[in-house]
Protein backbone atom coordinates (compact mmCIF):
# COMPACT_ATOMS: atom_id res chain seq x y z
CA UNK A 1 0.00 0.00 0.00
CA UNK A 2 1.48 3.33 -1.06
CA UNK A 3 1.99 6.07 1.48
CA UNK A 4 -0.26 9.08 0.90
CA UNK A 5 1.31 12.52 1.23
CA UNK A 6 -0.43 14.94 3.60
CA UNK A 7 -0.98 17.36 0.74
CA UNK A 8 -2.79 14.66 -1.26
CA UNK A 9 -5.51 13.86 1.28
CA UNK A 10 -9.05 14.04 -0.18
CA UNK A 11 -10.84 17.35 0.30
CA UNK A 12 -13.81 15.53 1.84
CA UNK A 13 -11.55 14.07 4.55
CA UNK A 14 -9.95 17.44 5.32
CA UNK A 15 -13.36 19.08 5.57
CA UNK A 16 -14.51 16.31 7.93
CA UNK A 17 -11.42 16.80 10.12
CA UNK A 18 -11.98 20.56 10.30
CA UNK A 19 -15.61 20.06 11.31
CA UNK A 20 -14.52 17.97 14.31
CA UNK A 21 -12.68 20.88 15.89
CA UNK A 22 -14.51 23.31 18.17
CA UNK A 23 -11.76 25.93 18.26
CA UNK A 24 -11.33 28.49 15.50
CA UNK A 25 -7.58 28.46 16.18
CA UNK A 26 -7.43 24.76 15.24
CA UNK A 27 -9.17 25.44 11.94
CA UNK A 28 -6.77 28.28 11.17
CA UNK A 29 -3.77 26.05 11.90
CA UNK A 30 -5.14 23.32 9.61
CA UNK A 31 -5.47 25.85 6.80
CA UNK A 32 -1.90 27.08 7.36
CA UNK A 33 -0.37 23.60 6.87
CA UNK A 34 -0.02 23.86 3.11
CA UNK A 35 -1.62 25.45 0.05
CA UNK A 36 -3.85 22.46 -0.78
CA UNK A 37 -5.19 22.29 2.77
CA UNK A 38 -5.94 26.01 2.74
CA UNK A 39 -7.99 25.74 -0.45
CA UNK A 40 -9.76 22.57 0.74
CA UNK A 41 -10.87 23.89 4.14
CA UNK A 42 -13.06 26.91 3.54
CA UNK A 43 -13.18 29.59 6.25
CA UNK A 44 -16.94 30.06 6.09
CA UNK A 45 -19.01 32.07 8.56
CA UNK A 46 -20.80 28.89 9.58
CA UNK A 47 -17.51 27.19 10.46
CA UNK A 48 -16.21 30.19 12.39
CA UNK A 49 -19.38 30.54 14.40
CA UNK A 50 -19.86 28.63 17.61
CA UNK A 51 -21.31 25.18 16.76
CA UNK A 52 -24.13 25.27 19.26
CA UNK A 53 -27.22 27.30 20.09
CA UNK A 54 -25.85 30.66 21.11
CA UNK A 55 -28.89 32.17 22.78
CA UNK A 56 -30.03 31.37 26.31
CA UNK A 57 -33.48 31.80 27.89
CA UNK A 58 -34.20 35.22 29.40
CA UNK A 59 -37.19 36.65 31.25
CA UNK A 60 -36.91 39.90 29.28
CA UNK A 61 -37.89 39.53 25.62
CA UNK A 62 -36.14 42.80 24.76
CA UNK A 63 -32.69 41.36 25.42
CA UNK A 64 -30.73 38.36 24.19
CA UNK A 65 -28.34 36.30 26.31
CA UNK A 66 -25.51 35.16 24.07
CA UNK A 67 -23.22 32.25 25.03
CA UNK A 68 -19.70 33.14 23.91
CA UNK A 69 -16.86 30.55 23.95
CA UNK A 70 -13.30 31.49 24.87
CA UNK A 71 -10.18 29.32 24.83
CA UNK A 72 -6.99 29.30 26.93
CA UNK A 73 -3.71 28.53 25.17
CA UNK A 74 -0.08 28.05 26.12
CA UNK A 75 2.19 29.91 23.69
CA UNK A 76 5.89 29.08 23.27
CA UNK A 77 8.67 30.57 21.15
CA UNK A 78 11.13 28.10 19.54
CA UNK A 79 13.90 30.71 19.70
CA UNK A 80 13.46 31.56 23.39
CA UNK A 81 13.17 28.91 26.15
CA UNK A 82 10.88 26.46 24.26
CA UNK A 83 10.03 24.75 27.57
CA UNK A 84 8.61 27.99 28.98
CA UNK A 85 5.38 29.55 27.78
CA UNK A 86 2.86 32.35 28.17
CA UNK A 87 -0.84 32.14 28.98
CA UNK A 88 -3.22 33.67 26.44
CA UNK A 89 -6.97 33.65 25.91
CA UNK A 90 -9.02 34.12 22.76
CA UNK A 91 -12.69 34.61 21.95
CA UNK A 92 -13.88 32.63 18.95
CA UNK A 93 -15.43 34.30 15.96
CA UNK A 94 -19.22 34.24 15.89
CA UNK A 95 -22.18 36.23 14.65
CA UNK A 96 -21.51 38.82 17.34
CA UNK A 97 -17.71 38.78 17.03
CA UNK A 98 -16.52 38.74 13.42
CA UNK A 99 -12.89 37.98 14.23
CA UNK A 100 -10.95 35.90 16.73
CA UNK A 101 -10.20 38.28 19.61
CA UNK A 102 -7.28 38.29 22.04
CA UNK A 103 -8.39 38.64 25.67
CA UNK A 104 -6.72 39.24 29.00
CA UNK A 105 -6.33 35.69 30.42
CA UNK A 106 -7.83 36.34 33.86
CA UNK A 107 -10.47 39.04 33.41
CA UNK A 108 -11.53 38.08 29.89
CA UNK A 109 -11.45 41.75 28.86
CA UNK A 110 -10.49 42.51 25.28
CA UNK A 111 -6.92 43.65 24.70
CA UNK A 112 -7.41 47.25 23.61
CA UNK A 113 -4.45 47.33 21.21
CA UNK A 114 -6.56 46.08 18.30
CA UNK A 115 -3.70 46.57 15.82
CA UNK A 116 -1.73 43.76 17.45
CA UNK A 117 -1.87 40.29 15.89
CA UNK A 118 -0.61 36.82 16.74
CA UNK A 119 1.28 34.99 13.97
CA UNK A 120 0.54 31.28 14.53
CA UNK A 121 3.32 30.25 12.16
CA UNK A 122 5.98 31.71 14.47
CA UNK A 123 4.84 30.30 17.81
CA UNK A 124 3.96 26.97 19.38
CA UNK A 125 0.30 26.72 20.42
CA UNK A 126 -1.26 24.15 22.75
CA UNK A 127 -4.86 24.36 23.95
CA UNK A 128 -5.43 24.19 27.71
CA UNK A 129 -9.20 24.39 28.04
CA UNK A 130 -12.33 26.19 26.90
CA UNK A 131 -14.51 28.51 28.91
CA UNK A 132 -17.80 30.28 28.26
CA UNK A 133 -19.28 33.62 29.20
CA UNK A 134 -22.67 35.25 28.82
CA UNK A 135 -22.97 38.48 26.85
CA UNK A 136 -26.18 40.53 26.99
CA UNK A 137 -27.39 42.18 23.77
CA UNK A 138 -30.26 44.40 22.71
CA UNK A 139 -32.77 42.02 21.11
CA UNK A 140 -33.60 44.46 18.32
CA UNK A 141 -30.23 46.03 17.53
CA UNK A 142 -27.92 43.11 18.40
CA UNK A 143 -25.75 45.60 20.28
CA UNK A 144 -23.99 44.69 23.50
CA UNK A 145 -25.60 46.18 26.61
CA UNK A 146 -23.23 47.42 29.35
CA UNK A 147 -23.93 45.83 32.73
CA UNK A 148 -23.53 47.27 36.21
CA UNK A 149 -22.88 43.82 37.67
CA UNK A 150 -21.05 40.76 36.40
CA UNK A 151 -23.00 37.88 34.92
CA UNK A 152 -21.09 34.66 35.38
CA UNK A 153 -21.58 31.53 33.33
CA UNK A 154 -19.99 28.15 33.13
CA UNK A 155 -20.88 25.69 30.43
CA UNK A 156 -20.24 22.00 29.75
CA UNK A 157 -20.48 20.39 26.32
CA UNK A 158 -18.93 17.03 25.48
CA UNK A 159 -20.22 16.52 21.95
CA UNK A 160 -23.25 17.11 19.78
CA UNK A 161 -24.77 13.86 21.10
CA UNK A 162 -24.36 14.54 24.82
CA UNK A 163 -26.58 16.88 26.85
CA UNK A 164 -25.08 20.30 27.51
CA UNK A 165 -25.35 22.07 30.83
CA UNK A 166 -25.21 25.79 31.50
CA UNK A 167 -24.96 27.66 34.78
CA UNK A 168 -26.67 31.05 34.51
CA UNK A 169 -28.07 33.42 37.13
CA UNK A 170 -27.21 30.96 39.95
CA UNK A 171 -29.39 28.26 38.36
CA UNK A 172 -28.57 25.28 36.12
CA UNK A 173 -30.06 24.60 32.68
CA UNK A 174 -29.73 21.63 30.34
CA UNK A 175 -30.07 21.21 26.58
CA UNK A 176 -30.37 17.67 25.12
CA UNK A 177 -29.05 18.14 21.60
CA UNK A 178 -29.31 14.49 20.60
CA UNK A 179 -33.09 14.72 20.73
CA UNK A 180 -33.00 17.29 17.96
CA UNK A 181 -34.09 20.08 20.29
CA UNK A 182 -32.09 23.19 21.09
CA UNK A 183 -34.36 24.50 23.84
CA UNK A 184 -33.05 24.90 27.38
CA UNK A 185 -34.72 23.22 30.37
CA UNK A 186 -34.09 24.19 33.98
CA UNK A 187 -32.86 21.33 36.21
CA UNK A 188 -35.58 20.32 38.69
CA UNK A 189 -35.58 20.60 42.51
CA UNK A 190 -32.88 23.29 42.75
CA UNK A 191 -33.32 24.27 46.40
CA UNK A 192 -30.02 26.18 46.52
CA UNK A 193 -28.29 28.80 44.41
CA UNK A 194 -25.12 27.63 42.68
CA UNK A 195 -21.80 29.26 41.89
CA UNK A 196 -20.05 26.79 39.55
CA UNK A 197 -20.38 23.51 37.63
CA UNK A 198 -17.75 21.05 36.39
CA UNK A 199 -17.40 17.80 34.41
CA UNK A 200 -15.43 15.38 36.62
CA UNK A 201 -14.85 11.66 35.93
CA UNK A 202 -17.68 11.63 33.39
CA UNK A 203 -20.23 13.16 35.77
CA UNK A 204 -21.44 16.74 36.14
CA UNK A 205 -21.22 18.37 39.55
CA UNK A 206 -22.26 21.76 40.91
CA UNK A 207 -21.27 23.63 44.05
CA UNK A 208 -23.74 25.80 45.95
CA UNK A 209 -23.01 29.06 47.74
CA UNK A 210 -22.48 27.17 51.03
CA UNK A 211 -19.75 24.93 49.60
CA UNK A 212 -21.77 21.70 49.21
CA UNK A 213 -21.35 19.59 46.06
CA UNK A 214 -24.36 18.33 44.08
CA UNK A 215 -24.58 15.72 41.32
CA UNK A 216 -26.65 16.51 38.23
CA UNK A 217 -28.65 13.61 36.76
CA UNK A 218 -29.03 14.34 33.06
CA UNK A 219 -31.43 11.45 32.50
CA UNK A 220 -33.88 12.71 35.12
CA UNK A 221 -32.96 16.42 34.89
CA UNK A 222 -32.66 16.52 38.68
CA UNK A 223 -29.92 17.39 41.14
CA UNK A 224 -28.87 15.47 44.27
CA UNK A 225 -26.64 16.65 47.12
CA UNK A 226 -23.44 14.58 47.37
CA UNK A 227 -21.46 16.21 50.19
CA UNK A 228 -21.95 18.47 53.17
CA UNK A 229 -20.81 22.09 53.12
CA UNK A 230 -17.12 22.87 53.59
CA UNK A 231 -16.12 23.79 57.19
CA UNK A 232 -15.31 27.41 56.44
CA UNK A 233 -14.72 29.68 59.43
CA UNK A 234 -15.35 33.35 58.66
CA UNK A 235 -13.99 34.89 61.85
CA UNK A 236 -11.05 36.45 59.94
CA UNK A 237 -13.12 37.46 56.92
CA UNK A 238 -16.28 39.36 56.10
CA UNK A 239 -17.52 37.01 53.40
CA UNK A 240 -16.76 34.35 50.83
CA UNK A 241 -16.66 36.39 47.64
CA UNK A 242 -16.69 33.44 45.25
CA UNK A 243 -16.72 29.62 45.25
CA UNK A 244 -15.31 27.54 42.39
CA UNK A 245 -14.78 23.89 41.46
CA UNK A 246 -11.45 22.63 40.14
CA UNK A 247 -9.74 19.31 39.41
CA UNK A 248 -6.40 18.82 41.16
CA UNK A 249 -4.41 15.57 40.95
CA UNK A 250 -7.59 13.67 40.07
CA UNK A 251 -9.54 15.05 43.03
CA UNK A 252 -12.54 17.36 42.88
CA UNK A 253 -11.72 20.43 44.96
CA UNK A 254 -13.57 23.52 46.15
CA UNK A 255 -11.90 26.93 46.04
CA UNK A 256 -13.18 29.73 48.28
CA UNK A 257 -12.16 33.33 47.55
CA UNK A 258 -12.28 35.22 50.87
CA UNK A 259 -12.68 38.96 51.26
CA UNK A 260 -13.05 41.83 53.69
CA UNK A 261 -14.88 45.13 53.19
CA UNK A 262 -13.40 48.46 54.28
CA UNK A 263 -14.93 51.84 53.43
CA UNK A 264 -17.49 50.09 51.20
CA UNK A 265 -14.69 48.54 49.12
CA UNK A 266 -14.47 44.74 48.93
CA UNK A 267 -10.96 43.31 48.78
CA UNK A 268 -9.76 39.71 48.34
CA UNK A 269 -7.46 38.74 51.22
CA UNK A 270 -6.99 35.01 50.71
CA UNK A 271 -8.14 31.63 49.41
CA UNK A 272 -9.07 28.29 50.95
CA UNK A 273 -8.90 25.05 48.95
CA UNK A 274 -10.67 21.88 50.15
CA UNK A 275 -10.90 18.30 48.90
CA UNK A 276 -13.03 15.42 50.12
CA UNK A 277 -11.17 12.72 52.07
CA UNK A 278 -13.02 9.58 50.95
CA UNK A 279 -11.72 7.46 53.85
CA UNK A 280 -12.66 9.97 56.55
CA UNK A 281 -15.73 11.16 54.65
CA UNK A 282 -14.99 14.79 55.44
CA UNK A 283 -13.49 17.90 53.88
CA UNK A 284 -9.76 18.49 54.40
CA UNK A 285 -7.88 21.68 53.54
CA UNK A 286 -5.33 21.55 50.72
CA UNK A 287 -2.37 23.53 52.08
CA UNK A 288 0.09 22.73 49.28
CA UNK A 289 -0.30 22.48 45.51
CA UNK A 290 3.22 21.17 44.99
CA UNK A 291 4.65 22.26 41.63
CA UNK A 292 1.22 23.36 40.41
CA UNK A 293 -0.40 26.77 40.22
CA UNK A 294 -4.10 27.57 40.37
CA UNK A 295 -5.50 30.03 37.83
CA UNK A 296 -8.74 31.69 38.98
CA UNK A 297 -10.04 33.45 35.88
CA UNK A 298 -13.39 34.91 34.96
CA UNK A 299 -15.65 31.94 34.08
CA UNK A 300 -12.88 29.37 34.55
CA UNK A 301 -10.68 27.80 37.22
CA UNK A 302 -7.86 25.34 36.47
CA UNK A 303 -4.32 24.29 37.41
CA UNK A 304 -1.10 24.49 35.40
CA UNK A 305 2.43 23.22 35.99
CA UNK A 306 4.35 26.28 37.18
CA UNK A 307 7.66 25.28 35.56
CA UNK A 308 6.05 25.40 32.10
CA UNK A 309 5.38 29.17 32.27
CA UNK A 310 7.63 32.22 32.45
CA UNK A 311 7.94 33.49 36.04
CA UNK A 312 5.03 31.40 37.32
CA UNK A 313 5.16 30.76 41.08
CA UNK A 314 4.40 27.21 42.19
CA UNK A 315 2.01 26.53 45.08
CA UNK A 316 0.24 29.82 44.36
CA UNK A 317 -3.09 31.19 43.12
CA UNK A 318 -3.29 33.88 40.42
CA UNK A 319 -6.40 36.06 40.24
CA UNK A 320 -7.49 39.47 38.97
CA UNK A 321 -9.23 42.40 40.61
CA UNK A 322 -10.36 45.93 39.76
CA UNK A 323 -9.08 48.92 41.71
CA UNK A 324 -11.05 52.04 42.66
CA UNK A 325 -10.40 53.43 39.17
CA UNK A 326 -11.92 50.30 37.58
CA UNK A 327 -8.52 49.33 36.20
CA UNK A 328 -7.67 45.63 36.05
CA UNK A 329 -4.73 44.32 38.02
CA UNK A 330 -3.36 40.85 38.66
CA UNK A 331 -2.41 39.43 42.04
CA UNK A 332 -0.85 36.20 43.25
CA UNK A 333 -1.67 34.53 46.57
CA UNK A 334 1.04 32.29 48.04
CA UNK A 335 -0.30 29.29 49.92
CA UNK A 336 2.86 28.75 51.96
CA UNK A 337 2.75 32.08 53.83
CA UNK A 338 -0.66 33.55 52.92
CA UNK A 339 0.86 36.69 51.37
CA UNK A 340 -0.51 38.52 48.33
CA UNK A 341 1.62 40.30 45.74
CA UNK A 342 0.22 42.52 42.99
CA UNK A 343 1.51 43.14 39.51
CA UNK A 344 2.11 46.84 40.14
CA UNK A 345 4.87 46.04 42.63
CA UNK A 346 8.08 46.73 40.68
CA UNK A 347 10.10 44.26 42.76
CA UNK A 348 7.78 41.37 41.82
CA UNK A 349 7.31 41.94 38.08
CA UNK A 350 9.04 38.66 37.14
CA UNK A 351 6.35 36.43 38.67
CA UNK A 352 3.79 37.91 36.26
CA UNK A 353 5.77 37.40 33.03
CA UNK A 354 3.43 34.60 31.97
CA UNK A 355 0.75 37.24 31.30
CA UNK A 356 2.93 39.57 29.20
CA UNK A 357 2.80 38.95 25.45
CA UNK A 358 6.15 39.91 23.84
CA UNK A 359 5.41 37.89 20.69
CA UNK A 360 2.52 40.04 19.43
CA UNK A 361 3.06 41.78 16.09
CA UNK A 362 2.40 45.47 15.55
UniProtKB/Swiss-Prot annotation:
SUPFAM superfamilies, A to Z: F-box domain (SSF81383)
Protein name: Putative F-box protein At3g25750
Xref: InterPro entries: F-box-like_dom_sf (IPR036047), F-box_dom (IPR001810), KIB1-4_b-propeller (IPR005174), SCF_F-box_domain (IPR051304)
Residue span, F-box domain: 4-52
Pfam families tied to this protein: Beta-prop_KIB1-4, F-box
